[in-house]
Regions:
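Carboxylate- and glycine-rich phosphate/diphosphate-binding segment that chelates Mg2+/Mn2+
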Residues: 1-75, 185
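Short acidic (Asp/Glu) and glycine-rich catalytic loops that position anionic groups and cofactors
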Residues: 42-43, 80-82, 114-118, 141-148, ...
Length: 214
């Protein structure tokens, strides 16, 4: 399997699980499978990235992906998928890549409205607090060259294109299931944060570097 396919699908599965858990439609069944999925995927995703022939880790990743599918089928995804779909349609990019690009910024936007749930996710992954969650996803993206793979898109993300992307995102599924329902302008800010992140080459990124004026 090409490394990019592993990366895109694994990060999409992790997003399925996280979004299912923070969805406004979350329930006992989706919560159970979402937490199991987050645990399975987070424990094995980097092993699979670093050792692609590790069949046991791949099996655990597959099980986690299956659990994540059950979870979001019962509670839905939200803003990372809404914005990711818009990005994919506009630039003809793989779905998993687009969702991975958007997810860190969506968590930053939604954090306060679902703090306790994000806190539980951080604990499952083994992070020392919710404020590390976006950085954890950013680092996964960096290791798998997700940011680098989309850098050529940065100059194409003009303000006009971002307006179109925001409208497209608002017209699809995943808006009302987000704990914090975004306005058109707030989605534009999220896309501008993505643009700014893609303009930063290499190194560890401090999240304040990606902030833009609202």
């Amino acid at each position: 399997m090409p490394p990019s396919v592993t990366s895109f699908t694994a990060l999409d599965a992790l997003t399925h699980a996280i979004e299912a858990f923070v969805s406004t439609k979350a329930n006992a069944m989706s919560d159970f499978y979402a937490k199991e999925a987050i645990s399975c995927i987070s424990k094995n995703i980097e092993t699979v990235f670093e050792h692609p022939n590790n069949i046991e880790a791949r099996q655990q990743l597959l099980i986690g992906s299956f659990y994540a599918g059950i979870a979001f089928s019962n509670s839905s995804t939200n803003l990372a998928h809404a914005t990711g779909r818009a990005l994919g349609v506009k630039f003809h990019m793989p779905h998993g890549q687009c969702v991975a690009l958007m997810h860190p910024f969506v968590i930053q936007y939604s954090l306060e409205s679902a703090y306790e749930r994000y806190e539980e996710i951080a604990k499952i992954i083994g992070l020392n607090g919710t404020h590390f969650l976006s950085g954890y996803l950013d680092e996964l993206n960096r290791k798998q060259h997700i940011w680098k793979s989309a850098q050529q898109m940065a100059p194409l993300l003009t303000d006009e294109v971002i307006e179109q992307l925001a409208e497209q995102a608002l017209s699809g599924n995943g808006i009302l299931t987000n704990r914090k329902v975004p306005s058109n302008e707030e989605i534009e800010v999220i896309f501008k944060q993505l643009r700014k992140r893609l303009q930063i080459e290499g190194g560890i990124v401090e999240w304040q570097q990606c902030q833009v004026e609202k």
